[in-house]
From Swiss-Prot:
The lineage of its organism: Bacteria, Pseudomonadati, Bacteroidota, Cytophagia, Cytophagales. Signal peptide: none annotated. This is Phosphate acyltransferase. Pathway: Lipid metabolism; phospholipid metabolism. Its EC number is 2.3.1.274. The gene is plsX. It catalyses: a fatty acyl-[ACP] + phosphate = an acyl phosphate + holo-[ACP]. HAMAP family: PlsX. InterPro entries: FA_synthesis, Phospholipid_synth_PlsX-like. It comes from Cytophaga hutchinsonii (strain ATCC 33406 / DSM 1761 / CIP 103989 / NBRC 15051 / NCIMB 9469 / D465). It is found in: Cytoplasm. Belongs to the PlsX family.
Length: 312
């Protein structure tokens, strides 16, 4: 299994990325290889100063970098030799099984939409986030930022996509799907959620439990939480602050530690023809390591194929 990693993406690249790659190489199953994409000489210089298992790390040269502040569409089209563009080329040509980056999120979305492209039948791909639950596991939240404005049909697709991910990656046989709303009653909500509710409840392939409220985010009520990207991104960013708050106050709590972005590593873009994971711009080596482990799980579970089958 060949897992590609953008060595130039992130606020602390390439050092933190390369350190994370070595941590992943030390801990991933034996069939995994890591392909670092970026400026080869710079990558080799960093590798030479670090200890760890480097035998499963290869390098693909890319002499351009898409900066965090660059316009995603313009940068992706004008920098075909950037580490992100090269990563998507390798993924499209099936030379790698997954592509991960902590770089420009917009460019990663552009690559997903216009390079490997959405799966036929999928209106728009969604980004999946992960919300800690009192039980000690995570619930999938989709969408958390790919689509600020959504159509009801998109939320219905997110319900299916999120359910497939939860079943095959988390191993939950009949995941409970909830629609994030301002009340449990079916007649409550916005024009979007009212229409989406009617579409989702007609889906025989998922276990829809109806609307859920903000107070249900952490109480194990739903395994999949469906929402538009605007709402989901607010939920995700709010959750990230919990770990910062308790850490500053000197608390060490197992539940709140799950809100540490490093523990998850990244967020998959679901509904496209390939395995793509985006990481936090401030990703540490630990976060990169966990993002690579997530890429391994995503690839092993064959989520893209499962989604294709659902819409074939």
């Amino acid at each position: 299994m060949r897992l590609a990693l953008d060595a130039m993406g992130g606020d602390f690249a390439p050092k933190a990325i390369i350190e994370g790659a070595i941590l992943a190489s030390d801990s991933l199953p034996a069939d995994a290889e890591i392909i670092l994409i970026g400026k080869e000489q710079l990558i080799r210089e960093h590798l030479s100063t670090l200890e760890g298992n480097k035998s499963r790390i290869q390098i693909v040269h890319a002499d351009e970098v898409i900066g965090m502040a660059e316009h995603p569409t313009k940068a992706f089209s004008q920098k075909p030799n950037s580490s992100i563009a090269v990563g998507f080329h390798l993924l499209k040509q099936k030379e790698v099984d997954a592509f991960c980056s902590a770089g420009n999120t917009g460019a990663m979305l552009v690559g997903s939409m216009f390079s490997i492209k959405p799966i036929e039948g999928i209106l728009r791909p969604g980004i999946a986030g992960f919300m800690p639950q009192e039980s000690g596991r995570f619930a999938v939240v989709i969408d958390v930022g790919a689509n600020a404005d959504c159509k009801p049909e998109m939320l219905a697709q997110f319900a299916v996509i999120g359910s497939l991910y939860t079943k095959y990656v988390f191993g939950i046989e009949n995941p409970k799907v909830g629609l994030m709303n301002l009340g449990e009653e079916e007649e409550k909500g916005t024009i979007l959620t009212l229409a989406a509710h009617q579409l989702i409840k007609e889906l025989d392939s998922i276990n829809f439990i109806g609307n859920i409220e903000g107070r249900d985010l952490f109480n194990n009520k739903a395994d999949v939480i469906v929402c538009d990207g605007y709402t989901g991104n607010i939920i995700l960013k709010m959750g990230e602050t919990f770990y910062d708050l308790v850490s500053k106050r000197g608390y060490d709590d197992t539940f709140f530690n799950m809100f540490n972005y490093e523990e998850v590593g990244g967020s998959p873009i679901l509904g496209v023809n390939g395995n793509v994971i985006i990481g936090h711009g401030i990703s540490s080596p630990k976060a990169i390591k966990n993002m690579m482990h997530q890429a391994y799980q995503l690839t092993q579970a064959k989520i893209s194929e499962k989604i294709k089958n659902a819409y074939s």
